[in-house]
Structures are given as C-alpha cells and as structure tokens.
Amino acid sequence: MIPKTKAEGVPDFVLLNQITENAFIENLTMRHKSDNIYTYIGDVVISTNPFKNLNIYKESDIKAYNGRYKYEMPPHIYALANDAYRSMRQSQENQCVIISGESGAGKTEASKKIMQFLTFVSSNQSPNGERISKMLLDSNPLLEAFGNAKTLRNDNSSRFGKYMEMQFNAVGSPIGGKITNYLLEKSRVVGRTQGERSFHIFYQMLKGLSQSKLNELGLTPNAPAYEYLKKSGCFDVSTIDDSGEFKIIVKAMETLGLKESDQNSIWRILAAILHIGNITFAEAAEQRTGTTTVKVSDTKSLAAAASCLKTDQQSLSIALCYRSISTGVGKRCSVISVPMDCNQAAYSRDALAKALYERLFNWLVSKINTIINCTTEKGPVIGILDIYGFEVFQNNSFEQLNINFCNEKLQQLFIELTLKSEQEEYVREGIEWKNIEYFNNKPICELIEKKPIGLISLLDEACLIAKSTDQTFLDSICKQFEKNPHLQSYVVSKDRSIGDTCFRLKHYAGDVTYDVRGFLDKNKDTLFGDLISSMQSSSDPLVQGLFPPTRPEDSKKRPETAGSQFRNAMNALITTLLACSPHYVRCIKSNDNKQAGVIDEDRVRHQVRYLGLLENVRVRRAGFAGRIEYTRFYNRYKMLCKKTWPSFNGTAKQATELILQQHNIDKEEIRMGKTKVFIRNPTTLFYFEEKRELEMPRIVTLIQKTWRGYRARSKWNQRKAAIKIQLFYRSYRYKKWFRELHRAFKDVARDPQWGKQVFWPKHPSILDRAVQLTHKIHNCWRAEKMILSLGAGQNHMRQKVMAYDIFHGKKKWDFRRHFDADYLEKPSNPNQQKYVLAMQNLFSTYGDTEVLFADYVIKVNPKGVPQRRGIVVTGTNIYKHDPKNYKVKKWGTPLVDVTSISISPMADTFLVLHCKAPQRDFVLDLGCNGYEAVSEITTVIVQQVLKLTGVKLSVQFTSSITYNNARPKGSDTILTFAPINNDPKLIGSQFKKGKGNQATIQFKD
C-alpha cells in the first residue's frame, strides 16, 4: 500500500505528516495527477473523478482484490467492496455502501464498479448466482436510460435516487435483490435549463427504433420536432452513443424478462408523451353562452397521442380543456364541467406528461423488483446508495430543495456515525479522548423537516389554504424563521442579491438561493381526475395499470404532498441505513469543465471543507480503527488462545485480555473500555482474522469428525432398532395374514377346482415378496393337482392342440397319428429289454424320472456323416444312445439349453435343435422309421421347456438353416433343402455334405 514514489502521495490521509488543509489538498492533487484516484481515510474511500477511462477495472483487477485485506493492495473501490462482502459473509449482517458527493463527482460510476465487483466474486458460488448477477447488472443501464440525463455539470447525471440491495445466501451467492427509488425529477420531462437534455431514453428511442416502428408510433427521428425536447436546445452528447445504448437497453429488457408486449407499451407511452408536448391550445368563443373556452388547436398531435395511449381522442381532448368539479354533498352532490383557460390547459397537459413518465418509471422499478426479488430464502444484504449529489444552479426550485435536503440527511448520518457518535463512544467507554470540533448540520435538517414548524410542514399548510400563493408561502417562512441564522430572505436581511421571490439556506455545502415560484404547484402535484379517467379507459393494459382505480377509503383522504412523501422516504432510508454496517465512498469533482488530468484546487478545497474530510482524518488518526464488544471478540477469537478454548469460566473481558496477552499485542495498540476492546491499527484486526482463518480448518475437521462419529453411531443404533421393529412387525403381520389365508383355504384339498375361486385376503405392502412366493407355491401345487387329475386322452389332446398351433399353415404334419411318446419301449423294438435296462440305469445315474419321447433317428455328426442313433427326451434332458447297446453317447443336453428349433416348410423330415454354447446343435432326421415324428418331438420339447422356464421356444420355418454342431467357433454350416422327384433310389430325406460349409437335404416332394 506504500506508494512507489513521493510524487504519488500517501495512500491514506491518516499517514500525512501534517494534518492541514493544504497538506490534504496537495496529497489529493498528487494522487489525482498520477491517476491514483482512490485514497483512504481509514475505512473511508475518497474518490476523485478523472473524467477519463482508467485501465484499473479489468477482470484481473477484481481477482487481485478479491479476498485480500485493504493494507495488502493499493487503495481502490474494489477493496471497499471486498470489505463489505467479507463482513457480510463473516457476520451474516446487513452491509451498506453510502456514496456521496456533488453532481458530477462520479457517484453513479462508483456504484456500478461496486456492483461489478460483487456480482463477479459472488456469482460462482451457486448455479443460480450467475443468472441473478446478470439481471442485477442489466437493471443498471435500464434505470440509467429512464432516470439519468445530461445536465450542465454531468453528462450522465442521476435525476433520481436509488438504493439497490443485493441479497445473499449463507455461502455468499446472490439470491435476489431490491431497488428503491427516490424523487424522480419528472419536471425534466416538460422543461429544463438551456443546454441540458431530457431523460436519455427519449433520444435513444428516436435513434434506436426502426423507421417502420417510428412510423407506427407517428414519430420522426428528428428530436427538435418535439417541444418537450427542443426547449433546452441540446440534442446530442459527445460522450453518449444514443443508438448503441438503445440496443443495450433492449437486450437488458429481454434479460430481465420483459415481454415484447410490455416493450411495445413502453415505446407507445414514451411516444405519447412527445406527442402530448406538441399539443397546443387556442381560445374560442362559445356562441351559446357568450363565454370564452379553450380548445386543442393541434388535433394531429392529439390524435397521435390518443392513438399511442389507445384511448378515445375526444375524451382526451375534453379532459385537457375541461375540469370536472363536485358541488354539494350526499344526495345533493352534482358534478359540473368547468372550462379552463390556455394556461390551465397547458398546465394540465404537462401534468399528464409528467404523471405518465413518473408512473412508467415506478412501474419499471416495480417490474424489475418482481423479477429479481427472492421470496423463498432469507439472507443478509449489501445495499448501495447512489443518490443525486448536492446541486446549486442559477435558478434553484422545489426539486433542488429536496435534493439538497437529501444530501443534508446523508451528511448528518455520516457525522453521526463517523464523528459525533465515535467521539461520544470514547467518552462513554471511559477512553481518554480530546474532543475534535466539526460542523454539525442538524439545525439545517430540522429547519427543513421539523414538525409542525419546518419548511416542508409550512409548505403543506400553504397547500391546504385555497387562497395561498407562492408569495404568501415565502412571507410565512420569512416570518417564522426571521431569527434563524440558517435562512435569509430579502425581507429579513435586505440583501439585494436575494430576489423578492427567493429565500437562501446555509447548507453544509454552501449557500443556495431558492426561487419559490412553482413551489405550491409542485408540492401539490395535481393531476385532475378527468385525465385519470381518460387513461383508465385505455385499452392498453399497461396504461390502465399505471392509473389504478381509487379505493373508496382512499378517496376521502387528502393526498400526501410531494414534499411530505420525500421527507418520509428519506427518514425510512436513514432507518434502513442505520440497521446496516456502513462503508463510505466520498466522491470529489476535480473540476467543473470535465477535463481529464485537471484539478481545480479551489473547487476541491470547497468540497473537502463541506464534506468534513479533514475532521474525519483527525478523528481517525487520534481514534481507533476497530472496536469490538468483549463477548463478540471472545466468541470470534477464543480458538487462538489455549486458556480460552474451547470454553472459559471467567468474564468475556478477562478472556479478551488473555487472548491479547498470548499474542503479545502492544499495550499502546489497544484500550480496554467498559464493554468493548478498542484497537488502534487495522493491521491488528487483520492479524487476528488471518490467525483465525489458519485455525478454522483444524477446528472444522475436529467438529466434522466428532459430528460424523456421533451421527454414524446414532444412525447405526437407529438402524438396528428399526430392523428389529421391522422384523417383529413383519412377523406379526405375516402370521396374521397366514392365519387369514389358512381360514380361507381350509377345505381347498376337497375343492374340485383346488382354490381357483377362493379370494386371497388383503395383505400389507411389506409382505409383497412373501405373498408372491406363497402364490407361486400354491399355483405349483394346483398345477400338479390338475395334471395328476388329467387322463391320458386329455394330455394327448393338449399336445395335439399345441402341435396345431405350431405347424398349421407352415408345414404339413400327420395330425391323425397318435403321439405314443416312448416308441423304443414297444414290443416291436427287437432290443426292448436292453432299452428298458438302459433307462433304469440312466434314471438311477442322472436322476431323470420320466420319458417324454424316445425313438430312432438319423443324427448328423460334426463331420457331416449321418449316423443312426436313439434319441430320448426326458423331463429335463436330451440323451443320444448307441442303438446296439443303448449306452449314453457322451452326456445329456439340458432342455433349458435349447434356444430355438428350425424346421423347413417343405416335405422333408429334418429338424435342427439350436443350443447354448458349449452344447452343440442337433441335426436330426425323424423320418427313418416310416412315419412323421417331427411334429411330436417339436411339441414335446416346446411344452416341456415352457413348463421348466415359463418361456415358449421359438420355432422357425425357413428354407435355409444355419447351425453349428462342431466345437470351434466360426464352423457354421448352411443347410438348404432340394426336392428331387426323379431319383428312384431316394427314400425319405437324405443329408448331402457339400463344398465348404454347405449342406443339402434331398427329399421327394
């Protein structure tokens, strides 16, 4: 933080060798000329406007300041923003940044830089953070377009006050925000000082909208064509690209979720305001009554305004030229229409334009708040106050009084928190202190706002009296404050520099003369009911919404004046700021000509004086950078001392002393008050924070370990208890259900249908699996009973039905032949006895219990040679026998390993059984015995596999079959079928090995 050269000055005014005004100005000048526009007074940032772009706001600069302490880096507004963000995260308390200074000092830019920093460092804390940050940032250009204007002192002057709050969650990610606006200078819409502009949005709209859209709104891009814009004679500003800014605004509207219909309504309202400004009036004689009335002389502008507002042209014309007045009360109440003169009509026209713009601006702020507001979570906020600076013009009116009153309130807050309250706290805590004098502006604030005798109260009183004028109001304040040293007038002081319609206030920033002409009208802020009714009849939902119906209970109330509204808003703002931990930015305007690199010492000196910066330096230098309550200090830093960690039985003050002693803090560096410890140098606070940050990971690990152990033990015990309870409960429910089931199926064994019509009792969901198993057991038992009850004829019929289902329409089969199953057990088999003995041996060896099919077949071996074999299909396996001795060839093939069956649709007698590896496929000829047996073995295998697995085998009928009855992979054989009717030697079907992997079945068709 120490400057590189003496020419750069000291980075903190507290470090000056001499605390004098000249030394202060000299240091400020040196730093400004070396482009070091930021300087500290302790925690306060002093910012001078360089009137040029500086390369100190890059993303790399934000990263450099993020998470660093002030003393580690050169002075910067990012350092203050980082302090606010860190304080918010550490304490979970609301923070606010109060930016003050006169118009053109750089307050708006300062607020944008703070927002830029906060959104960047916080948006990566959660997925939603970046979206919220972008919406908060995009609200800035939108509000600037509608709320800022070019003035003589500032090309981008805020003509409204704004307090923007960013809300964060516990981890520091933005979750929402809120914008509160104060006193929009709506009079700027209809008039302003020569050389100034109206609000930016009018010029941006005219240059940014397409020609077709302008034509639709009845507009021309030529700004001087509109009375409201040409009055001041300023249309373009060299530092503002109106066309480019308009594109940014439209993009911001889209980001914030403003629908296209809303955008179109906004352009129509703005266009209507410009058309309203072009409406002129002329007097006309009323022949019937002989009186003079007023009428709209420019009907073209009237029609354009009515079209944009989507309201009736005639009703708008009447509302501008006539005023409805209620007479009498109750049943005698009547409404009469009173014509206005040209001046009154012009006043009514301007009032409508101002009301439209102000209500549109308030709607826009409300719309943004609806979009960015967070209602689901609560968390600390960081508020940024960007409000108009102190203003002194050649002609100062009601608006300047309110603006300067606002600055007086903020100066009073600064004095209360940094000068007055700080010194009072030292005395209250028993700290030795030499009092430092400062200018207290409290009497001026009371002069303006005090009730019942204050400028605002007297102005409200004048507005209540029908015959009051601006002059009678001036007379009343001159009389009331005749002896008040802070208010002067020509009547009281005979000072000829004060006009006879003016009074002068001695503000903290200097004397300002106010002209009372227009004070009453501006305070009343009257908009006649006829115009409100005309707007309420609009078919545009937005225009209607800007003028909501008056509630019956509100219609009897006297409307609050503009002055009272602003006073109440200011008091509410001060209450909000007092509830936050403040951070200050004091902006100084380097010169009035907006020249880069130039510093006007006289102008700067004046600002330094009225801002009380020198007194701030003296208090800061003589005082203490930090003060913390003993309890809070102990709770935050107790882990830094063995004697206070993890708990301490003494007082918080004693614990604080022990912590300071262990770290050898110099006695001159601290003072022990009655309830707080005072620390002189901020580096001491930073030292404790750094030590705490180093210690926290160890403590967090310890807490996590302890908590995880406790949680794991608790969960384990809970789980054991839960399992035990579940077991007992399930056992109870299962037993109860089984008792009900037993009663339901009591006589099921004697039931002819074995319980088919019995209703199963309802069961709880926890028994789903058990009930499924019980159902399965019952179904198996019932199926067994049904099968055992079937006669041989019934089973044979079932097989025929299945065979029909498989073969019908796909291959000819002998449906008349009886399925005898075991053909080898018949007496016709010459080796019957050998077969029977072989089957007995097979059953005892392999555990099979029944034969479903047995017959002689021709089996094709892996070499492609047909061999005569006996094939036996049992309840679980397929066996191959040598027909000579009936020995099992190799091993049996499980039926569940059969994956599909392939058969040709022709007249041959072959079939292929496809099996899972490592089993080989079977290629069988079942026609060697003189009868068709393909249908029987196919039906038997399909039926038994369905019984074993619940899956019906796929039977494919195809004229080309690929099979593999050899071990190696890739040794597939393609089998085709060829009918041959001219070979007398061919009997039945024959297998012919072809070349390569080809083979053919020859048969007589």
From Swiss-Prot:
In the record, biological process GO terms are: actin filament organization; actin filament polymerization; actin filament-based movement; chemotaxis to cAMP; endocytosis; phagocytosis; phagocytosis, engulfment
Query: Where is the region Actin-binding?
Result: 556-630
Residue spans with biased composition (Basic and acidic residues)?
551-560
Give the disulfide map.
none
Task: Please state every residue range assigned to the domain named IQ.
Answer: 694-722, 716-745
Q: Where is this region: Disordered?
A: 539-562
What residues does the Myosin motor domain cover?
8-693
- Role: Myosin is a protein that binds to actin and has ATPase activity that is activated by actin. May play a role in moving membranes relative to actin.
Record note on quaternary structure: Myosin I heavy chain is single-headed. Dimer of a heavy and a light chain. Inability to self-assemble into filaments.
Name of the molecule in the record: Myosin IE heavy chain
**Which organism is this protein's natural source?**
Dictyostelium discoideum (Social amoeba)
Taxonomic lineage is: Eukaryota, Amoebozoa, Evosea, Eumycetozoa, Dictyostelia
